[in-house]
Design a protein with these regions (language model features):
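A short, glycine/small-residue-rich beta-strand->loop->alpha-helix junction that serves as a flexible
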Residues: 77-89
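Non-catalytic membrane-proximal stalk/linker segments that position and tether the catalytic domains
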Residues: 2-72
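Short amphipathic alpha-helix
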Residues: 88-97
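Acidic anion/phosphate-binding donor-loop and adjacent secondary structure
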Residues: 49-64, 177-183, 219-236
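Active-site donor-binding segments of glycosyltransferases and PAPS-dependent sulfotransferases
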Residues: 100-156
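Active-site proximal beta-strand in glycosyltransferases
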Residues: 149, 162-179, 200
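Membrane-proximal helix-turn-helix segments that form the acceptor-binding/catalytic region
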Residues: 137-144, 182-200
């Protein structure tokens, strides 16, 4: 339950920004104790603009890729928070792929607290893995690559729209519709599993669910243990 609530807050921060999240939390708190809301959102939220990323707006040049692009993988990710386990898995995969000769790019989409791709890259290298990947902000910075990977439901929409890639994959670590009550966000998250991406799932349960319920082609990445981080302590 706590893990689900924490993830929901992270998703809200991704969509609303830190200030928007604080306003949302304050207004909820104010309603509970019958205080006037500090900032009214009535009339301020442009729903169409808020969900504009859902629209089918193809971008990026199609056609043949050069030799460099054919060994390049784009990773489209939500904003990075220090200590995020989901991001840790993504950056570990990037780090290992680079050791095997692949070029990787990281594209942060949606709201981010970073001012530049360079700032984000420095933070990733300091707090996660020393990746060599170029890091950029915004889906407009996507460049041609053999493979483009979505890593959350809000990143799946720009990956669907990006035309400068030969293959689209979806690294799925959670069944994200379950983070919401049945409503718009639940449906928007669920719809991403029917976009025709090739799914790479954390564990077999997700692979079976996405295949059975959404017709998604999937492969499973088993759960592993980094013995450099997790190891039994000597008995006292």
């Amino acid at each position: 339950m706590l893990r689900r609530k924490f993830h929901s807050l992270k998703m809200l921060q991704t969509k609303l920004g830190l200030r928007g999240l604080l306003v949302y939390l304050w207004n909820r708190f104010a309603r509970r104790i019958h205080l006037p809301a500090a900032v009214s959102t009535q009339g301020r939220t442009d729903i169409f603009k808020f969900y504009d990323f859902l629209n089918d707006k193809p971008f990026g040049a199609t056609g043949a890729l050069d030799a460099y692009a054919m060994r390049t993988i784009n990773w489209v990710i939500p904003d990075v928070g220090i200590g995020s386990g989901g991001h840790l898995n993504i950056f570990r995969l990037i780090f290992l792929l680079e050791q095997r000769g692949y070029h990787c790019r990281v594209i942060i989409t949606g709201h981010t607290h970073f001012n530049s791709g360079e700032e984000a890259r420095d933070s990733i290298r300091k707090h996660f893995f020393p990746i060599n990947a170029e890091v950029s902000i915004g889906e407009s910075s996507l460049k041609a690559a053999a493979i483009t990977v979505a890593t959350s439901w809000i990143t799946a929409y720009p990956v669907r729209n990006f035309q400068g890639t030969h293959h689209r994959c979806y690294f799925v670590q959670d069944y994200e519709p379950y983070f919401y009550a049945h409503g718009s966000d639940y449906c928007f998250a669920e719809a991403t599993y029917r976009m025709g991406f090739h799914g790479i799932t954390a564990g077999g349960w997700l692979a079976e669910k996405l295949s059975a319920e959404h017709g998604m082609q999937t492969v499973t990445m088993g759960f592993s243990l980094d013995h450099g981080l997790y190891r039994p302590l000597p008995r006292r």
